[in-house]
Amino acid sequence: MLVLVSPAKTLDYENKAGTIEHTLPKLVQHSEQLIEECRKLAPSDIASLMKVSDKIAGLNAARFTSWSRDFSTDNAKQALYAFRGDVYTGLDADTLSQQSIERAQKHLRILSGLYGLLRPLDLMQPYRLEMGTRLANIKGTNLYQFWGDVITDEVNLALSEQGDQIVVNLASNEYFKAVKPKSLNGSLITPIFKDRKNGQYKVISFFAKRARGMMVRYILDNNIKTFSGLTEFDAAGYYYCEAESTAQAPVFKREEQ
């Protein structure tokens, strides 16, 4: 089972990672091409392109300038511990056991606008470049055109290395659009999380993001390998709703919080 998640805008480079083990990102040559394009942008261009404040634009201009092809624990941090945000709050990487960390390295991949596809322990220099950014580049006018088949090929490689043909999509639509489902060498499962509010069950972004992280944690801690194993997920009050589910889209519901 290979699990795909989105990155996060919020980064933590202040606190130490939960392990000293690390690997190097595999698609750095592509990242370097994007960095070259980003370095051409003035802070005002970044602010407009990314729809961020002048302060955040200035910070990211500095990050693009200081980015180096040489990765070390001095200028980078393992992706699983660098990202913060709702998904990563649900996952709570800081409390993972060594066994779950090892499973994550094999069975979890993080989609990234700059790095393409990251393993959890891949070192990552700080950046902000969302997959939906319309950054002109040598391959087109956006990052989907830039990455083309590269990310899908890496997902298929990871599938072959980890031993089965199940992809669990816990990423946002923005990021999963960088993957080509018809080219995947496996079956795709996209869990849906619904919370009850005002008498109706609906997908509420904040809760759904945390639920995705909690499901990642559940998969890692329990060594889940099958669809039926996924349906036993019951963290934080969620329960499997068989009546609304399909083999491709299991639905999990929760009562009003």
Curated annotation (Swiss-Prot):
InterPro entries reported for this sequence: YaaA
Protein name per the record: UPF0246 protein Ssed_1188
Biological process terms in GO annotation: response to hydroperoxide
Family statement drawn from the similarity comment of this UniProt entry: Belongs to the UPF0246 family.
Disulfide bonds: none
GO CC, alphabetical: cytosol
